[in-house]
Structure formats: C-alpha cells, structure tokens
C-alpha cells in the first residue's frame, strides 16, 4: 500500500502515544459462520487470523445485508476496528446489529494482510518543514526507544514521554515514519503534519 497521511497532535507536558498498524495487500478472506443480532455485533469466522484492533470489512453475508460493505473493494469508511475475542470470534464495537435482518449463511471477513515486522527497525523524524531542521526523532534504538515494534500484535507504537513533550518549544512541524528492513529497504508508511499544543493543566 502507498504511504498513508495522518495529522498528529502533541499536548505539551502530556504523554503522546499512537499505535500504527501496517497494512498491505493482498486482501485476506475468512469465511463467516455466524453473526449475532446485538450491540455490539459478534462475528464468528473459524481461524480468522485477525490481530486485535485490526480493520475488517464484512462482505457477502446472507440475510444480514445491512452489515455488508457496499463497494468492492470496500471503501475506508466501510472497515471497522475489530476486537479479537478468540481465534474464531470478533467483536465490531462500532456496529449495533440488533435491528438488522437475521444472518442466514455465507459471507467473509475481509481485511488487509498484516505486514510481518520481523527484522524491521523504525524511525520517525519531526522537522520544521519538509527537508528542514530536525526537531525531534523517534527510533527503535534502545537509547531512544520511542518506537516499539510488536510482531505478535502487529503494532508499531510511537511514544513521547510527558517529560519530553514538556520541553517542546515548537508549535508545528512535519513528520514521516519509515520502516527499515533487515536488507536495508526503506518504506515510508505514514506522513503528515504534527502540532504541539500548550497544556491546560500543569
């Protein structure tokens, strides 16, 4: 997938934390065997393989047409953040299916492939402008430790401590997050602007 764009905010004097999930093609499909009529909805798909917190779309489910993505491939707004209840069940907290038509059969949980993070390191630089002066860096290097990779959960966690954000003197910048493979291949996966706001409570 191409680099995603997201604008971030830091509150000075507060801990900044953001969890990134690196998605890639191809899509994966897991057959559905049951969908509850409840809020939140629970979907059963044996051995779904979906990491907790991953985005999923429901497609081609029989009976409960209301839950299906309308477009193929699904649009970003048709994906829902999934809570992994077990290896066979997922909860979609955003979806209340209590008033939907009863599920009959078929359908798939569709989701992007989670990238294998083994062998990767990560780095993120905040600059005053594109190609400008570095304001702050985040890396997976132990001495820095502001980025943590979890290949089991398939997460990339960015953290800036409250102590460090309190020292921020700039108000706005730009950033990019790069993943570096063991072979030295660099992939930019996220970029955007970042704003540092003054805290209200000290």
PLM-predicted stretches and their roles:
Residues 1-28, 112-202:
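Contiguous segments within soluble domain cores/interaction surfaces
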